[in-house]
């Protein structure tokens, strides 16, 4: 059964409660694996899914134009890192903008309704926003802009208990992933 989550911490909590056995996490949740809350069993890829997206109708045509604007972000995510790198590239910091804490679904709604001027989020939200705003959507920065500075790994994880009891399942799962990528 496939279950969708808003982020890695929620996935790891669902594993800890026994609701799911395996999950795929992005960059930020790897810290929880380092803390021992989950076990990485398959490195998936490096992510290029994050972006800072702005609405040009809000007077934003460059990263520098974010100064004084309201930006939706989910703290602790790789998208927030991209936002910080983008701001820095224009000589700005988070102190120069108004940040609004929001999950990915909220960002889509806020961008479409005009409730925020820009957002830092990942796919598929970036695509949904671009489709909804059309020509008014402007991607200001992505992971690709900073690959020489930071890498965002994605991995498949499980609990230590599931890994110990189901080694063969994890091997078959990993082999299936590799075969699908071939």
Predicted segments, located by residue:
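A local structural motif
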Residues: 1-4, 19-21, 37, 88-102, ...
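Extracytoplasmic/periplasmic, Sec-exported soluble proteins
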Residues: 3-7, 22, 44, 55-58, ...
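Pocket-flanking alpha-helical
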Residues: 6-39, 50-64, 79-86, 105-110, ...
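Pocket-lining segment of extracytoplasmic ligand-binding domains
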Residues: 28-29, 100, 105-182
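A structural signal for short loop-to-beta-strand junctions that line the ligand-binding cleft
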Residues: 37-45, 69-71, 138-147
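Residues that flank catalytic or metal-binding motifs in active/ligand-binding sites
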Residues: 48, 67, 152-154
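Short helix-loop capping/hinge motifs at secondary-structure junctions, enriched
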Residues: 56-65, 92-94, 161-170
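Short loop->beta-strand "edge-of-pocket" segments that line small-molecule binding or catalytic clefts
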Residues: 64-76, 175, 179-181
């Amino acid at each position: 059964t496939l279950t969708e989550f808003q982020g890695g911490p929620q996935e790891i909590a669902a594993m800890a409660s026994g609701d799911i056995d395996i999950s795929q996490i992005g960059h930020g949740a790897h810290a929880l694996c380092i803390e021992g809350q989950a076990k990485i069993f398959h490195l998936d890829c490096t992510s290029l899914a994050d972006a800072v997206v702005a609405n040009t109708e809000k007077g934003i045509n460059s990263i520098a134009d974010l100064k004084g604007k309201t930006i939706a972000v989910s703290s602790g995510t790789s998208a927030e890192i991209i936002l910080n790198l983008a701001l820095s590239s224009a000589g700005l910091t988070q102190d120069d903008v108004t940040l609004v804490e929001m999950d990915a679904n909220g960002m889509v709604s806020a961008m479409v309704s005009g409730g925020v001027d820009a957002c830092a989020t990942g796919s598929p939200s970036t695509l949904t926003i671009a489709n909804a705003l059309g020509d008014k959507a402007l991607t200001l920065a992505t992971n690709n802009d900073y690959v020489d500075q930071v890498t965002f790994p994605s991995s498949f994880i499980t609990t230590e208990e599931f890994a110990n009891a189901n080694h063969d399942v994890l091997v078959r799962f990993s082999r299936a992933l590799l075969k699908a990528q071939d």
